[in-house]
């Protein structure tokens, strides 16, 4: 029976699935090709039963439960699909004019195409997977476009709907009369036309492109969706919801509503079109053309709108427009805001009913009208622009540039306008302009009924008669103000930069920008002087309550009087001879100058204010606040200050003056200043012939100046930083240096009461000091090459001398040191008492300094530190030369400065004494150089000088040289590094249980642990060494080869760790040095047996190792010296194994007696790095490339006890004797001297021990060895070994 297949849409799979049932259909039925059907179904995801293929079918009805499938390049036309019926078009199938009725469906799949399908109410057309539907009519029916489906020219009406799913595409859809298009996420609709009662709902980010909305049509854009290049005609509507974006919309009479959270970009509004922006919406770059409107509601914000001619932007309560470009109209209504608007080319900005505009710029032919409570701030009117301030309008901070105009009338108010060159302000009837500033060539016109209560203008000429009282005015240079008569108010025209006032009263004048007010008589009240404005008060005139601001000046000339002037920052009052000023207040930055013959009374100088009172001037009852500045001289008269009653200047004497913040006191010739204090930025100037006494203190960054200063009191320098003091200082007083900085002095300093350095330091540079000096703790002085101190020095801090001369005694209770230069020579023409430290070697490279004193006394615990390049008698060294006597006791600390050491004969002179040599000097530290120790002795070896003190490299009262014990430590490390890892074949191979010559074991591992002690002597005859050592070596055979004719070959690897600690004692000086050595080795070895290792025959062995060590040497009183050694050692040797005798005991146990003559040669190539000790000695190894030869014989017995008769255990006791010869003796070369370990050239060695086989694979051994050579050299060691064979 033929089978048919119905198909059911699966929402979960988003595909058609097959259901089997009986089939009926029209056209060509291919029921028997069931397999083919299933194959097609499997490729396209659909099922079908009635197939149309290879022919064209016309007409036909697909009834309930039937499926018609159209495929394979043929088609069907005029089919009718009724309720429950399905038509499937795919795989090249094509249908035309299909009618799909209620509950019928047409499915267009891969490569299927339909044209002019009619889908009635309840019917559905599905287009997916490469299917194409063209010119479908949805008369109440539905069309769904799925992924890769495409529909074009669909017509939707009578409640029909089109849904575009992700990946679906539609083009040129026409929607009308209740039709609806829904663009789901991922779907795309382009060129859709929406007619009356049609609707498009957009939910896709890809959205709708080039939609055309006619009258009555609606487009709704939802969150996350986009609509691009939509055209909305008259009566059409576009709604942009929260999260949606509309870009490039054209409103050609239609409406766009942008809701909260919605965004519209680059909208164009034409004739009768309206864009409405609601709260929370964002709209940018809208263009409003002729007849178009942009309405901004409460909370809405738009930016960069362009309004062209006859277009309108309406800003309602709470709405805001930013950076609009207005060539049409902008209307700012109640509580609306416009910011940074540009108005030009016939554009109007209307600000009314409480609207606000800020930062508007008005260019050529632009207009701004402010009325009915409107407010505009910071408007800029450029050339050709106009601002009108009308009834109840208010403009603040308007800037009028060249040819810009502001009209104020009918109750309008302009405040603080700035009228620049060419700018114009017109004030008409009932208009008011307050606080305008009219700059150069600006113009302000006040017409009849206009008011300008506080006039900022550029006034040039003003004449005030005795009966007149002018308005307040600010006076600038070059401008013009014209005031016309209204209701009897006077008028005047100001044309010059001079305002002259004759008998009468003027008040409230403002004089600016080089303007000038001349008061020849009468009273001037309340003048304000700004920006280089000037007021001159002549004889007969009085100025009261003047205020001097930045660069404002008031000049009080002879006969002129001022009262109550206030001088602010930059303001100045100058009182000339015959002028008088009273009650002047000087604030921060203000200044009052009182010249010779001028008089001021009651001046109040605040913090930061300045008063200058010249010689011949007087300042009475002045009040100088803290931080106020006083400039005066001893020739002025300042009898007292109300705040400091003790301060006075009169009759060439100033007392208790405090100078700060620029304050100046000049002490003139013959004048005296007593108890002067100079604080930060204060200045004290002392002319030649002027004197300071009492306590003069210079603090912080205060300044004292003068070429010859006479100080008869306490002169205290307490400055904050380092400074130079380049003046002559004389007098009967004392100079006290009390700040932490450094003072550099060059000149002649004479102070009868001395110089006291309490803190910081003084550098005397080319100075002559005629005074006793005291250097306190934490203070210092540096006496340079060219400086001379004529006086005693008491040092509790630090003194640095160079090529200096001190003509006086020194008591040193701290540090007296040379500078860091080389070969310095200082002279003390007086006695030196040393209670602490004298340092002649401040660096490790300063050898050669000489200190010459008249007499020297040392107290117990005192130290003299010297240095030198230690070699022989002529070593370069620091020296103390005493022209007179020495007494007391001092320690000597001597430092070798990279000297290589050498043998001395007469000694190295470090202290020379010409008088009585009663002082005792002793070395406090150990002095070494090269291979030698140095000692200190009084007198030289030849006996020609029994007063001086000498360093010698021989033992006291003996010609024997003192060799350092470090020689032995270095030599021992050298020897050990080359010998610790030595071994021979017997120490490595171990005894085996096998006695035949079968194939040897395939591999083995072994370990040897050795401990021992060795001792020896150096060839200097003074130093003996003792060393303990520990060695752990392990290895293993990694390759074995056996050949009947060639013998047995073995290759192995080995490594080891060793450490040693030793001590060398010099038995002549009792000084000692300790050495340590630890390191590692890695190497390879090889052996050959002629007939196997347990048979009679020849054998040979060789090995090579790389060794590296860390070493140290620590001598008594010296720094620990650390260095490295590394290098190769290699060995070659051989011998003959001989079974001398074999026997069998009564118990049946076999024993053997063996002899083994052998020979071994070892090359030793481990060397140390060249090392320089802390004292400069260069250390190198001696005995490099030594070849050690060992020849000997070994006897052994293979035995087994009766207890072990039936086991594999066997033992081999042995004894061995060797002769050892070394081609070189190991040692050390320290600078140019070499010391060797004696007795190591030829040595004898005895070994004994036992080897045992525990199991077939495990063997152990133990033994002791003793070596002995000449000069008492010997070594004893014990070893344990273990070997495991595989």
Swiss-Prot record:
GO terms for biological process: cell adhesion. The chain crosses the membrane at residues 1006-1012, 1030-1040, 1048-1058, 1080-1087, 1098-1108, 1127-1138, 1153-1164, 1187-1198, 1211-1221, 1243-1253, 1260-1267, 1276-1284. CDD domains: PL2_Passenger_AT. Residues 1-49 form the signal peptide. GO terms for cellular component: cell outer membrane; cell surface; extracellular region; periplasmic space. Changing residue 878 to A/N: Abolishes autocleavage. No effect on subcellular location. Glycosylated on serine residues by AHH and AAH2 in the cytoplasm. Glycosylated with an average of 19 heptose residues. Glycosylated with either ADP-L, D-heptose or ADP-D, D-heptose. Glycosylation is required for protein folding/stabilization and resistance to protease-mediated degradation. Glycosylation is required for bacteria adhesion to mammalian cells. Glycosylation is dispensable for cell outer membrane localization. Glycosylation is dispensable for AIDA-mediated cell-cell aggregation and induction of biofilm formation. Glycosylation is dispensable for interaction with Ag43. It holds the Pfam family AC_1. Keywords: Autocatalytic cleavage, Cell adhesion, Cell outer membrane, Glycoprotein, Membrane, Periplasm, Plasmid, Secreted, Signal, Transmembrane, Transmembrane beta strand, Virulence. InterPro entries: AC_1, AIDA, Autotransporte_beta, Autotransporte_beta_dom_sf, Autotransporter_Adhesin, Autotransporter_pectin_lyase_C, Bact_Autotransporter_VF, ESPR. Changing residue 871 to A: No effect on autocleavage. Residues 998-1286 form the Autotransporter domain. Glycans are attached at residues 102, 111, 116, 154, 242, 252, 334, 391, 409, 539, 545, 558, 569, 576-577, 582. Intercellular AIDA-AIDA interaction is responsible for bacterial autoaggregation. AIDA can also interact with antigen 43 (Ag43), and the resultant intercellular AIDA-Ag43 interaction causes cell aggregation. Potent bacterial adhesin that mediates bacterial attachment to a broad variety of human and other mammalian cells. Has additional virulence properties, as it is capable of mediating bacterial autoaggregation via intercellular self-recognition and it is a highly efficient initiator of biofilm formation. NCBIfam families: auto_AIDA-I, autotrans_barl, O_hepto_targRPT. The signal peptide, cleaved at the inner membrane, guides the polyprotein to the periplasmic space. Then, insertion of the C-terminal translocator domain (or beta-domain) in the outer membrane forms a hydrophilic pore for the translocation of the passenger domain to the bacterial cell surface, with subsequent autocatalytic cleavage. Finally, the mature AIDA protein remains in contact with the cell surface via non-covalent interactions with the translocator pore. This is Autotransporter adhesin AIDA-I. It comes from Escherichia coli.
């Amino acid at each position: 029976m033929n089978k048919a297949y119905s198909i059911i849409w699966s929402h979960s799979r988003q595909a058609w699935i097959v259901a089997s049932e009986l089939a009926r259909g029209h056209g060509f039925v291919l029921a028997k090709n069931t397999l083919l059907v299933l194959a097609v179904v499997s490729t396209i995801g659909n099922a079908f039963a009635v197939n149309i293929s290879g022919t064209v079918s016309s007409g036909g009805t697909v009834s309930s439960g039937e499926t018609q499938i159209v495929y394979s390049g043929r088609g069907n036309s005029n089919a009718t699909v009724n309720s429950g019926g399905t038509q499937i078009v795919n795989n090249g199938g094509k249908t035309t004019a299909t009618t799909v009725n209620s509950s019928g469906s047409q499915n267009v799949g891969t490569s299927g195409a339909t044209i002019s399908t009619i889908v009635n109410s309840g019917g559905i057309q599905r287009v997916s997977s490469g299917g194409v539907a063209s010119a479908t009519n949805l008369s109440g029916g539905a069309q769904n476009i799925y992924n890769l489906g495409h529909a074009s020219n669909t017509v939707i009406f009578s409640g029909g709907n089109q849904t575009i799913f992700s990946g679906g595409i539609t083009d040129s859809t026409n929607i009308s009369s209740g039709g609806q298009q829904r663009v789901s996420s991922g779907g795309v609709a382009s060129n859709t036309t929406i007619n009356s009662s049609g609707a498009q709902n957009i939910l896709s980010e890809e959205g709708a492109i080039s939609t055309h909305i006619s009258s009555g049509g609606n487009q709704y854009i939802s969150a996350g969706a986009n609509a691009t290049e939509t055209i909305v005609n008259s009566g059409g509507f576009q709604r942009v919801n929260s999260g949606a974006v509309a870009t490039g919309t054209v409103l050609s009479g239609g409406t766009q509503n942008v809701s909260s959270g919605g965004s519209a970009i680059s909208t164009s509004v034409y004739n009768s079109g309206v864009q409405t922006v609601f709260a929370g919406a964002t709209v940018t770059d809208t263009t409003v053309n002729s007849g178009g409107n942009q309405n901004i509601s409460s909370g809405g914000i738009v930016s960069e709108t362009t309004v062209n001619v006859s277009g309108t932007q309406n800003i309602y309560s709470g709405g805001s427009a930013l950076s609009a470009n207005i060539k049409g109209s902008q209307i700012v209504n109640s509580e609306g805001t416009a910011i940074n608007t540009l108005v030009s080319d016939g554009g109007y900005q209307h600000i009314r009913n409480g609207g606000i505009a800020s930062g508007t710029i008005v260019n050529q032919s632009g207009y701004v009208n402010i009325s009915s409570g409107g407010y505009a701030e910071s408007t800029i009117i450029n050339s050709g622009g106009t601002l009108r301030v009308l009834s109840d309008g208010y403009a603040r901070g308007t800037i009028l540039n060249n040819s810009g105009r502001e009209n104020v009338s009918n109750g309008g108010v302009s405040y603080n306008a700035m009228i620049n060159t060419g700018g114009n302000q017109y004030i008409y009837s009932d208009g008011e302009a307050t606080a305008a500033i009219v700059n150069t060539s600006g113009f302000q016109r006040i017409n009849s009924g206009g008011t300008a209560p506080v006039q900022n203008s550029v006034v040039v000429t003003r004449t005030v008669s005795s009966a007149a009282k002018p308005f307040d005015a600010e006076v600038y240079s070059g401008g013009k103000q014209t005031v016309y008569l209204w209701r009897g108010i006077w008028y005047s025209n100001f044309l010059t930069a001079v305002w002259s006032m004759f008998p009468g009263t003027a008040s409230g004048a403002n004089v600016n920008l080089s303007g000038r007010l001349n008061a020849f008589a009468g009273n001037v009240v309340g003048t304000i002087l700004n920006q280089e404005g000037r007021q001159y008060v002549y004889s007969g005139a009085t100025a009261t309550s003047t205020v001097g601001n930045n660069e404002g000046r008031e000049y009080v000339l002879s006969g002129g009087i001022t009262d109550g002037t206030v001088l602010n920052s930059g303001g100045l009052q100058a009182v000339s001879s015959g002028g008088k000023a009273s009650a002047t207040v000087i604030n921060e930055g203000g200044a009052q100058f009182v010249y010779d013959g001028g008089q001021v009374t009651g001046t109040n100088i605040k913090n930061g204010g300045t008063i200058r009172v010249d010689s011949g001037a007087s300042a009475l009852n002045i009040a100088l606040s803290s931080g106020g500045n006083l400039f005066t001289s001893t020739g002025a008269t300042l009898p007292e200050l109300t705040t400091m009653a003790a301060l006075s200047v009169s009759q060439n004497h100033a007392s208790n003056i405090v100078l700060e913040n620029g304050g100046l006191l000049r002490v003139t010739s013959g004048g005296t200043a007593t108890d002067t204090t100079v604080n930060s930025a204060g200045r004290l100037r002392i002319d030649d012939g002027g004197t300071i006494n009492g306590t003069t203190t210079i603090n912080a960054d205060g300044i004292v100046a003068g070429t010859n200063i006479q100080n008869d009191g306490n002169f205290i320098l307490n400055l904050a930083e380092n400074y130079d003091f380049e003046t002559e200082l004389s007098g009967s007083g004392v100079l006290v240096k009390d700040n932490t900085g450094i003072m550099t002095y060059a000149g002649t300093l004479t102070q009868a009461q001395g110089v006291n350095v309490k803190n910081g330091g003084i550098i005397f540079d080319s100075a002559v000091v005629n005074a006793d000096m005291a250097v306190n703790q934490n203070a210092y002085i540096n006496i340079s090459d060219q400086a001379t101190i004529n006086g005693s020095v008491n040092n509790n801090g630090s003194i640095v001398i160079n090529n200096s001369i001190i003509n006086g005694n020194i008591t040193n209770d701290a540090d007296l040191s040379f500078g860091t230069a080389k070969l310095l020579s200082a002279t003390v023409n007086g006695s030196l008492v040393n209670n602490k430290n004298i340092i002649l070697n401040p660096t490790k490279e300063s050898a050669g300094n000489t200190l010459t004193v008249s007499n020297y006394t040392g107290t117990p615990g005192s130290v003299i530190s010297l240095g030198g390049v230690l070699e022989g008698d002529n070593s370069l060294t620091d020296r103390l030369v005493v022209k007179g006597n020495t007494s007391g006791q001092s320690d000597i600390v001597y430092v070798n400065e990279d000297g290589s050491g050498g043998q001395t004969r007469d000694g190295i002179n470090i202290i020379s004494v010409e008088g009585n040599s009663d002082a005792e000097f002793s070395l406090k530290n150990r002095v070494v150089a090269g291979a030698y120790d140095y000692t200190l002795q009084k007198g030289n070896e030849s006996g020609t000088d029994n007063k001086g003190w000498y360093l010698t490299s021989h033992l006291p009262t003996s010609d024997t040289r003192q060799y350092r014990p470090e020689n032995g430590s270095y030599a021992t490390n050298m020897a050990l590094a080359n010998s610790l890892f030595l071994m021979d074949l017997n120490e490595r191979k171990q005894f085996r249980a096998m006695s035949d010559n079968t194939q040897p074991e395939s591999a083995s591992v072994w370990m040897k642990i050795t401990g021992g002690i060795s001792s020896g002597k150096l060839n200097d005859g003074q130093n003996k060494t003792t060393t303990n050592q520990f060695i752990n070596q392990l290895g293993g055979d990694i390759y074995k080869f056996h050949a009947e004719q060639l013998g047995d070959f073995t290759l192995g690897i080995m490594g080891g760790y060793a450490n040693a600690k030793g001590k060398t004692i010099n038995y002549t000086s009792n000084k000692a040095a300790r050495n340590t050595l630890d390191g590692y080795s890695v190497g390879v070895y090889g052996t050959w047996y002629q007939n196997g290792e347990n048979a009679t025959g020849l054998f040979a062995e060789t090995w090579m190792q790389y060794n590296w060590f860390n070493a140290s040497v620590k001598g008594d009183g010296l720094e620990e010296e650390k260095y490295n050694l590394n290098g190769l050692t290699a060995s070659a040797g051989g011998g003959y194994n001989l079974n001398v005798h074999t026997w069998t005991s009564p118990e049946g146990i076999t024993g053997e007696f063996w002899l083994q003559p052998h020979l071994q040669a070892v090359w030793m190539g481990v060397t140390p790095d060249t090392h320089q000790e802390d004292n400069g000695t260069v250390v190198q190894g001696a005995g490099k490339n030594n070849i050690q030869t060992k020849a000997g014989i070994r006897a052994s017995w293979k035995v087994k006890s009766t207890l072990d008769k039936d086991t594999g255990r066997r033992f081999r006791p042995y004894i061995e004797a060797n002769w050892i010869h070394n081609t070189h003796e190991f040692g050390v070369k320290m600078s140019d001297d070499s010391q060797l370990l004696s007795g190591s050239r030829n040595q004898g060695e005895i070994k004994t021990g036992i080897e045992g086989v525990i199991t077939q694979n495990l063997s152990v051994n133990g033994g002791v060895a003793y070596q002995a050579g000449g000069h008492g050299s010997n070594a004893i060691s014990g070893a344990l070994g273990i070997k495991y064979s595989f």
